[in-house]
Amino acid sequence: MTMDKSELVQKAKLAEQAERYDDMAAAMKAVTEQGHELSNEERNLLSVAYKNVVGARRSSWRVISSIEQKTERNEKKQQMGKEYKMKGDYFRYLSEVASGDNKQTTVSNSQQAYQEAFEISKKEMQPTHPIRLGLALNFSVFYYEILNSPEAIAELDTLNEESYKDSTLIMQLLRDNLTLWTSENQGDEGDAG
């Protein structure tokens, strides 16, 4: 059953009142396909229908596009943080075997890379993100073993211990280091007394 022009226009008006713009556009499309010249009211209904149909899709597209851009930026930042962490790791490994001025340079490079990774991870990652936890572990090892600094213990002691599957192993390693280093420090204090 095909509707005549006046029924389709009435259907479009009802669809507009119900804010069903896809139905409104379909009704007005059917009016135009009949081949008759459109009145001002019909042209207005057609315009309103398509403006709202397209507007809703444009709005949805903007939201999706914005989310994609934020996600891409976040992924790039996380990747950058991971790469700085790796750079810090490799310079730390070099500083373990270097000597003299070369050791100072590798220690400095390692610390700079870890610090960059740390700043990025604070802004871009959750506290329990595996990369951020791995960074905390390796940076604390750097402080304790390379710089011989007790700051590593204080840093590890402030970590939040939420249980996330990917983070559990790293958090256990952090806890093991804290226990080991605390017992070593207590042993050193006992020897001094």
UniProtKB/Swiss-Prot annotation:
Residues recorded with modification N-acetylmethionine: 1
Major subcellular location class: cytoplasm
Cross-link position per record: Glycyl lysine isopeptide (Lys-Gly) (interchain with G-Cter in SUMO2): 51
GO MF terms, alphabetically ordered: protein kinase inhibitor activity
Residues with Phosphothreonine modification: 2
PROSITE patterns, per database record: 1433_1 (PS00796), 1433_2 (PS00797)
GO biological process, one term: negative regulation of G protein-coupled receptor signaling pathway
Modified residues (N6-acetyllysine): 5, 51, 70
Modified residues (N-acetylthreonine): 2
Site (Interaction with phosphoserine on interacting protein): residue numbering on this chain: 58, 92
PTM (free text): Form alpha differs from form beta in being phosphorylated. Phosphorylated on Ser-60 by protein kinase C delta type catalytic subunit in a sphingosine-dependent fashion.
Modified residues (Phosphoserine): 60, 149, 183
SMART domains assigned to the protein according to its UniProt record, in alphabetical order: 14_3_3
Keywords assigned by UniProt, alphabetized: Acetylation, Cytoplasm, Isopeptide bond, Nitration, Phosphoprotein, Ubl conjugation
Entry-linked Pfam families: 14-3-3
GO CC field: melanosome
Coiled coil: none
Transferase found in the keyword field: no
PANTHER family (UniProt xref): 14-3-3 PROTEIN (PTHR18860)
Subunit structure: Homodimer. Interacts with SAMSN1 and PRKCE. Interacts with AKAP13. Interacts with SSH1 and TORC2/CRTC2. Interacts with ABL1; the interaction results in cytoplasmic location of ABL1 and inhibition of cABL-mediated apoptosis. Interacts with ROR2 (dimer); the interaction results in phosphorylation of YWHAB on tyrosine residues. Interacts with GAB2. Interacts with YAP1 (phosphorylated form). Interacts with the phosphorylated (by AKT1) form of SRPK2. Interacts with PKA-phosphorylated AANAT. Interacts with MYO1C. Interacts with SIRT2. Interacts with the 'Thr-369' phosphorylated form of DAPK2.
Function comment: Adapter protein implicated in the regulation of a large spectrum of both general and specialized signaling pathways. Binds to a large number of partners, usually by recognition of a phosphoserine or phosphothreonine motif. Binding generally results in the modulation of the activity of the binding partner. Negative regulator of osteogenesis. Blocks the nuclear translocation of the phosphorylated form (by AKT1) of SRPK2 and antagonizes its stimulatory effect on cyclin D1 expression resulting in blockage of neuronal apoptosis elicited by SRPK2.
Name of the featured protein: 14-3-3 protein beta/alpha
